[in-house]
Amino acid sequence: MSEFIYLASQSPRRSQLLALLGVRHELLLPDADEDAEALEAVLPNEAPAAYVKRVTQLKLDAALQRLKRRGLPAAPVLCSDTTVALGRKIFGKPTDAADATRMLKELSNTTHRVLTAVALGTARKREQVLCESRVTFSAMSSRQIQTYAASGEPLGKAGAYAVQGRAAAFISHMSGSYSGIMGLPMFETAQLLQSFGFKV
């Protein structure tokens, strides 16, 4: 059995959460010529749960190929993807502050879902879990939205906000997994790791 795993994610939050589980990990980041963002394209009429699970599998496929291509020591690879959904509408990462403003206006004064899929796999075995949480935003003023969008924090975040950042001031209620909303659900990830023989 391997003594460590690879984390195929550029998210510092996921790395921090994984470290809390006590499992040693090494980053397995995309090569410069890999278009990682292209994997996140939404298919027509794709449901949010199907989308986030498909993208996570694509990320795992790409990471396992990367591992083989680089000739690195074999070990399980962990991938994760988070998306925000209002009904069937998927909110990915905003392209700029104006896009973040548009997303936040739509999410203001609503309860939306945050779906995080996690996959752990090797060339011979793979497992996947899905964690769904709900977040309720209060009614945000235009000034609050514009100030937050201009802060830069929404960039690179699904739904244009970070639950562990300034956006917490707008969240009136949440249910489910706080770590899942951050990007790596601890309970479900621990279950995956245990299924691969890791002691968590």
UniProtKB/Swiss-Prot annotation:
UniProt xrefs under Pfam families: Maf
Membrane spanning residue stretches: none
Gene Ontology molecular function terms on file: dTTP diphosphatase activity; monoatomic cation transmembrane transporter activity; UTP diphosphatase activity
Keyword terms of this UniProt record: Cytoplasm, Hydrolase, Nucleotide metabolism
Single GO biological process annotation from the record: potassium ion transport
Gene3D superfamilies hit by this protein: 3.90.950.10
Paired cysteines (S-S): none
Cofactor: a divalent metal cation
InterPro entries: ITPase-like_fam (IPR029001), Maf-like (IPR003697), RCK_C (IPR006037)
Known EC number: 3.6.1.9
Active-site positions on this chain: 81
Predominant cellular place of this UniProt entry's protein: cytoplasm
Annotated site location: Important for substrate specificity: 13, 82, 164
GO CC annotations, alphabetized: cytoplasm
Catalytic activity: dTTP + H2O = dTMP + diphosphate + H(+); UTP + H2O = UMP + diphosphate + H(+)
Cell location: Cytoplasm
SUPFAM superfamilies xref list: ITPase-like
CDD domains named among the record's database cross-references: Maf
UniProt-listed HAMAP family: Maf (MF_00528)
Similarity annotation: Belongs to the Maf family. YhdE subfamily.
Reported function: Nucleoside triphosphate pyrophosphatase that hydrolyzes dTTP and UTP. May have a dual role in cell division arrest and in preventing the incorporation of modified nucleotides into cellular nucleic acids.
Name assigned to this protein: dTTP/UTP pyrophosphatase
Lineage, top ranks: Bacteria, Pseudomonadati, Pseudomonadota, Betaproteobacteria, Burkholderiales
